[in-house]
Amino acid sequence: EARKILSGVEKTTSYVRNIHEGKAGTIKIGFISSSISGFLQTLVLAHRNKYPNVKIEMEQSISNRISDGLLENEFDIGIERIPVTLTAGLIAHDMPPESGSVAINENHPFAKRKQVRISDLKDQDLIFYPRWNGPDGYDDVMSMFREYGVEPNIVQEAPAQMTIAGLVASGIGIGVVPECMAKIKVANVTHRKLQCTKGRTGFTLITREKKDLLVNQFLDLAMMTKID
């Protein structure tokens, strides 16, 4: 009996030591839908390989909800997109920027082009996410259309990127999506770069200003990890 007690004490002591050294514990991540294009998977896999005893809990959400969750300690890290307005007490750690693109049904005439201009989208049926899903990104894209004198004809809104892809496959319209979504293959859907959008968007990792060791380790690894 004494040996069992001693063994239990040793295990507890070891676990506490591992937590203190950043080798054990839990990280809670809130992420937006476009991060499933490979960004999220790459980071989590790299982290699990280096810190196998650190548990990662993930929940898909929307931009505003992620920010609230960080402030309420429901999340430790939020994966969002720039541009994003930061709430007091939060800080952003930007990843490499990317361009915008369009998701097109393979039977659409634009599928024969190498790239699409913003002006080409005039009078086209478009699919985009609702403003409540990410106000900053939504407003930025609408501003981009106005810069080129285009009034976007949004015929369908969808909060999740994979839903947008499904609607494009169904012939509902053209999806305005981040470039990374081209990595996810969907039947009857192809992607083309949207001209003049280079560096307009990209992922960012949002954290509280006061970060613990586990979060700092995740951020350090994220900055060193190559995202294809």
How should these model regions be labeled?
Residues 21, 92-100, 104-126, 216:
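Flexible hinge/capping segments at coil-to-helix
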Residues 71-79, 100, 150, 168-175:
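Alpha-to-beta junction loops
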Residues 1-18, 24:
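Alpha-helical "hinge/linker" immediately C-terminal to small N-terminal DNA-binding modules
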Residues 125-148, 212-219:
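Secondary-structure junction motif
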Residues 24-87, 158:
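Central regulatory/effector-binding core of bacterial HTH transcription factors
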